[in-house]
């Protein structure tokens, strides 16, 4: 039951964010901007967190992994990202990407050398455990 509540709550938050972007862009009604299969997980003892990640112009994060599921939504600027076997891609405001458990996030950086960038990471992870592990 908790698993459903967490997933429904996370999905509702993402839909509200989609509504906000649509309203700001002058669009009407909800639209699907992202869909991705997720692994079959038992999520007892897990929690959902919203983490804002801000990048100064040209700034990047070191390669890392998340033991849980991370859904990233670009709030400002452009984010250059490479997750798992997917090709490196630039995401713009309103676009999303997902990191499934323990996938290598090899590239995470601001695509601009002159403008800031920001994303919201909705992270589903085990309570009391680190959300991120830096790649050695």
PLM regions with names:
Residues 1-18:
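N-terminal secretory signal peptides and thylakoid transit peptides that target proteins
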Residues 17, 22-27:
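Boundary at the C-terminal end of the N-terminal hydrophobic targeting segment
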Residues 28-62, 126:
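A short glycine-rich, His/Asp/Glu-containing loop-to-beta-strand
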Residues 60-62, 80, 97, 101-110:
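Histidine-centered metal-chelating micro-motifs
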Residues 69-80:
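Short, conserved beta-strand element in jelly-roll/cupin
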Residues 85-102:
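Short acidic-glycine-tyrosine-enriched beta hairpin
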Residues 87-88, 103-129:
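Ligand-binding loop in jelly-roll beta-barrel domains
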């Amino acid at each position: 039951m908790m698993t459903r509540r967490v997933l429904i709550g996370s999905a509702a938050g993402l839909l509200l964010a989609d509504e906000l972007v649509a309203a700001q862009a002058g669009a009407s009604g909800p639209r699907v901007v992202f869909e991705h299969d997720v692994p079959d997980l038992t999520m007892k003892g897990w929690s959902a967190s919203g983490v804002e990640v801000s990048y100064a112009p040209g700034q990047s994060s070191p390669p890392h992994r998340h033991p849980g599921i991370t859904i990233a939504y670009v709030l400002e600027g452009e984010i250059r990202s490479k997750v798992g076997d997917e090709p490196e891609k630039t995401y713009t405001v309103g676009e999303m990407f997902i990191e499934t458990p323990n996938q290598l996030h090899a590239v995470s950086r601001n695509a601009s050398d002159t403008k800031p960038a920001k994303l919201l990471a909705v992270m589903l992870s085990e309570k009391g455990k680190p959300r991120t592990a830096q790649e050695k």
